[in-house]
Amino acid sequence: MNASRQGAVGPTIAVAAGKGGTGKTLLATSLAVALAENLTSGPARRGVSTVQLLDCDVEEPNADLLLQPRFISRRPVSIMVPQVSKTLCTLCGLCAQKCQFSAIAVIREVVVTFPELCCGCGVCAHVCPERAISEVQRPVGVVDLGRTEEGIEFVQGRMNVGEQRAGPVTRATKRFIEPQAISILDAPPGTACPMQETVEESDYCLLVTEPTPFGLSDLNAAVETCRSLHVPCGVIVNRDRPQEGYQPLDEYCRAEGLPVLLRIPETREVAEAYSRGRTLARAFPEWAQPLREMYGQIKKSIPSA
């Protein structure tokens, strides 16, 4: 288990994909439903109190469309941005030199700040020799908290329109991870910073892919990202076509030592259910057991889980 989560009972499982549209959110929500139903109707898992679904795709969260939670509260997310005192500032330019994000600049005899570029690190205020820079709060998004009919604790981060940095809202969303819960993180698509911010410090990452050349290419990028973060990962093949197959995908997984934990067939029934906003576990009860068995495999591969 990740060192930062020592003492936690339930694992944190991220669900990611190299690109959008692979079925990542369908898998994350279906797994959450299957596990939550097992907690309430099946034998209770030792020490685990509940299942959480955290939608960390903060630019465009949509897991709520499938789970239909009842939202209970909303928490604002803000970062600290610089405010420069014109009377104290000597225009030395040290703040602009140290800012890695070009969020502050000295232009002629004026200090200009660009709040939308600021990450809130505070280095400008720290290095100012005249103490001319103070910090003020700037709203960047919200975190919505709710609960589904199965008892899933639902956490959804959402950036304000026009914001450019997902990191602050993603981190705020992840602060609601509970150590006594099975926490499933729906990551944003791709392998850029927002995905890495979500997957980082997870106990395991499920990578959803498709049996196509593009799917394999994106999977390779996602695997490399997980390994750079030291997060173990397994593969879910969505839209699987057993009759046709795609040998390079299976060969890649074998060569890289990646377990293929689940295959979701390409059927009209699954596509129709998804288009109506239904998870696998709700639309097809027979899918609940394979999802739970997959979770059991994941648990076995997490040290001390």
Question: What are the residue ranges of the model-derived segments?
Answer:
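C-terminal lobe/tail of nucleotide-utilizing enzymes
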Residues: N2-Q6, T225-A305
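Short beta-strand-centered segment that lines the nucleotide-binding/catalytic pocket of NTP-utilizing
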Residues: T40-G42, R46-D64, Q137-V143
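Switch II (G3) loop of P-loop NTPases
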Residues: C56-D57, Q156-V161, R165, T170-M195
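N-terminal glycine-rich dinucleotide-binding loop that anchors FAD/FMN and/or NAD(P) in oxidoreductases
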Residues: Q68-K86
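Inter-motif core of Ras-like GTPase G domains
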Residues: P194-P213, L219
